[in-house]
């Protein structure tokens, strides 16, 4: 006679779910039947809680409890786990671990998450949340910074950080085939989805592509919200899977909620922008059928086109940067939603009003803050590593909001009087921008793009050699050219360099290089709050080592220049033996291992 295995599940609350299985492991992956908790006696409930707590402590302290494998996430971060537990709980892990070959018996097994979850990159906190449930059968609250945005006035119930976190855990629950977690998280998401900003609703539709119809209830509710919203058709078409876009159009038609259709001339402008053809846009405007404001072309370019295309369209200065689209968004609001610092700075320089609010009272700064995860914003990056764009946008907008008067960038540039002064200033600014590019790559790329530095010719130390590139195509400026031509080309380079430096000083004050380039007294560089005399001395010594490295490089290049038939006098070194004003090759490691911070 066959033996029937009975499975019971006790749910104590929305955050607890335990399986009490007769004849199977507690962590059996099979689905279970639901029974009221009163079927379990108090001692049984206490025993299950104790077991859950013990297993959760095993996960939270993996090294203490002899974990034997690591899950490697994108970026190299690792989560320790126990193969026996995950193999029993998640069939996908059992299959993946079976294919892993250990090189040595003592070597910890490492499993790449991308080999299991191939279609979407998930964060550390999402992985920990799902694996904690696998161990304990209990849904734990995520760390505050993992599902909270930067805005202190936000309740963090339905902001973008919360949406991103929920999408990630829903995806992992689907990939790991944990049906009970799929149900729990979908139910939680349905409780908050009505509070989500309509632009963030579009993010949820990723689940359709990733998980098919697994989250049909959630996706159907999102479709209902989008149908009744005023979001533009062009945004829907570019953001949604084609079948969902068509479904929304059909429902709107049935409910007589169709928005006005775009005119043919506006569509042509959008097509030209999609093709990154700003020249074609100019030709279409000459026909006189419409203009950039009537077509909301700048809004479209900022939202959907390449950064260069949007920047080139803005540089035409044919559109009102403070114009609101039918949904009440200015161009700056749209740039904030995109979290692109170059576009935000460009708009501010063109006169965009940072204090303009959306119809629901959000400024551009609030928009960016609610799109940026708190953990990402609070995590400081080391010099030389890329900064996150969300944090840069917040930095720019916060600084700009404090300014009472925005002086023109060009006002700080006084033209050099003599060729020697021009050469000295070029060498100084080339040095400064090169160092900034080394230490703050994203910030420098942002401001030098606005200053159009790449459109000018770099001035290098080799340009000082009289016989440089004789008989070859010139790739940098040559001082043997006619004086007027030299002066004009160098002035263009100097203007771009100065504008790059001034933009960096204005919008990224923490990236100041004054303590490298212009310090007359090293004592003030070493004087930092909470420093000890020993630390100040160490900093001062390290600074002197850097100067010696740079001076040694200069001396070697000077000897090479001296071998030429017509040596030229040089003033590349200040009389006080400060940093040499020339374009130098510097080792990134020399700066990354210095003991002091960025400072102003």
Curated annotation (Swiss-Prot):
Superkingdom of the source species: Eukaryota
A single MF term (Gene Ontology): zinc ion binding
Location of the region described as Salicylic acid-binding core (SBC) in the Swiss-Prot/TrEMBL record: 386-523
Cross-referenced PROSITE patterns: ANK_REP_REGION (PS50297), ANK_REPEAT (PS50088), BTB (PS50097), ZF_C2HC_NPR (PS52046)
UniProt keyword Zinc, yes or no: yes
Start and stop residues of the ANK repeats: 264-294, 296-323, 327-356
Oligomeric and partner information: Interacts with NPR1 independently of SA.
Function per UniProt: Salicylic acid (SA)-binding substrate-specific adapter of an E3 ubiquitin-protein ligase complex (CUL3-RBX1-BTB) which mediates the ubiquitination and subsequent proteasomal degradation of target proteins.
Domain remark text: The BTB/POZ domain mediates the interaction with some component of ubiquitin ligase complexes.
Family statement drawn from the similarity comment of this UniProt entry: Belongs to the plant 'ANKYRIN-BTB/POZ' family. 'NPR1-like' subfamily.
Name of the protein in question: Regulatory protein NPR2
């Amino acid at each position: 006679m066959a033996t029937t295995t009975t499975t019971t599940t006790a749910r104590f609350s929305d955050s607890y779910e335990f399986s009490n299985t007769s004849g199977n492991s507690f962590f059996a992956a099979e689905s279970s039947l639901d029974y009221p908790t009163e079927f379990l006696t108090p001692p049984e409930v206490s025993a299950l809680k104790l077991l859950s707590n013990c297993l959760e402590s095993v996960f939270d302290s993996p090294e203490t409890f002899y974990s034997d494998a690591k899950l490697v996430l994108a970026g190299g971060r690792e989560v320790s786990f126990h193969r026996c537990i995950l193999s029993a709980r998640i069939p996908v892990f059992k299959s993946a671990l079976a294919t892993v070959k250990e090189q040595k018996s003592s070597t910890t097994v490492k499993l790449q998450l991308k080999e299991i979850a191939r279609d979407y990159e998930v964060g550390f906190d999402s992985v920990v949340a799902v694996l904690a449930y696998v161990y304990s059968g209990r849904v734990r609250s995520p760390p505050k910074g993992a599902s909270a945005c930067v805005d202190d006035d936000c309740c963090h119930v339905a902001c973008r950080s919360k949406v991103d976190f929920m999408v990630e855990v829903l995806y992992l629950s689907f990939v790991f085939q944990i049906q009970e977690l799929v149900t729990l998280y979908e139910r939680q998401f349905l409780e908050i989805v009505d509070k989500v900003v309509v632009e963030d609703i579009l993010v949820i539709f990723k689940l359709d592509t990733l998980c098919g119809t697994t989250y049909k209830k959630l996706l159907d509710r999102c479709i209902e919200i989008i149908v009744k919203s005023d979001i533009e058709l062009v945004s829907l078409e570019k953001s949604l899977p084609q079948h969902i876009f068509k479904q929304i159009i059909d429902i709107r038609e049935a409910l007589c909620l169709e928005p006005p259709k775009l005119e043919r001339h506006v569509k042509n402008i959008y097509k030209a922008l999609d093709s990154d053809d700003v020249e074609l846009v100019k030709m279409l405007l000459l026909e006189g059928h419409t203009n950039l404001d009537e077509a909301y072309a700048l809004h479209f370019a900022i939202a959907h086109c390449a950064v260069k295309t949007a920047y080139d369209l803005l540089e035409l200065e044919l559109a009102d940067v403070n114009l609101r689209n039918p949904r009440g968004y200015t161009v700056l609001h749209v740039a904030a939603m995109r979290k692109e610092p170059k576009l935000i700075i460009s708009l501010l320089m063109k006169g965009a009003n940072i204090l303009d609010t959306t119809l629901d009272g959000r400024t551009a700064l609030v928009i960016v803050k609610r799109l940026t995860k708190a953990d990402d914003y609070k995590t400081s990056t080391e010099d030389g590593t890329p900064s996150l764009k969300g944090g840069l946008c917040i930095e720019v907008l916060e600084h700009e909001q404090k300014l009472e008067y925005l002086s023109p960038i060009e006002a700080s540039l006084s033209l050099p009087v003599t060729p020697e002064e021009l050469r000295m200033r070029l060498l100084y600014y080339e040095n400064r921008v090169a160092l900034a590019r080394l230490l703050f790559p994203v910030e420098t790329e942002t401001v030098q793009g606005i200053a159009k530095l790449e459109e000018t010719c770099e001035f290098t130390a080799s340009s000082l050699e009289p016989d440089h590139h004789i008989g070859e195509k010139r790739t940098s400026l040559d001082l043997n050219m006619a004086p007027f031509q030299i002066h004009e080309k160098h002035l263009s380079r100097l203007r771009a360099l100065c504008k790059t430096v001034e933009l960096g000083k204005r919008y990224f004050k923490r990236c100041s290089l004054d303590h490298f380039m212009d310090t007359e007294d090293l004592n003030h560089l070493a004087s930092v709050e909470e420093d000890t005399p020993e630390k100040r001395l160490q900093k001062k010594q390290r600074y002197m080592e850097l100067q010696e490295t740079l001076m040694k490089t200069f001396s070697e290049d000077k000897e090479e220049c001296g071998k030429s038939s017509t040596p030229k006098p040089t003033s590349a070194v200040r009389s006080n033996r400060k940093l040499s004003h020339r374009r130098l090759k510097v080792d990134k490691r020399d700066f990354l291992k210095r003991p002091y911070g960025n400072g102003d």
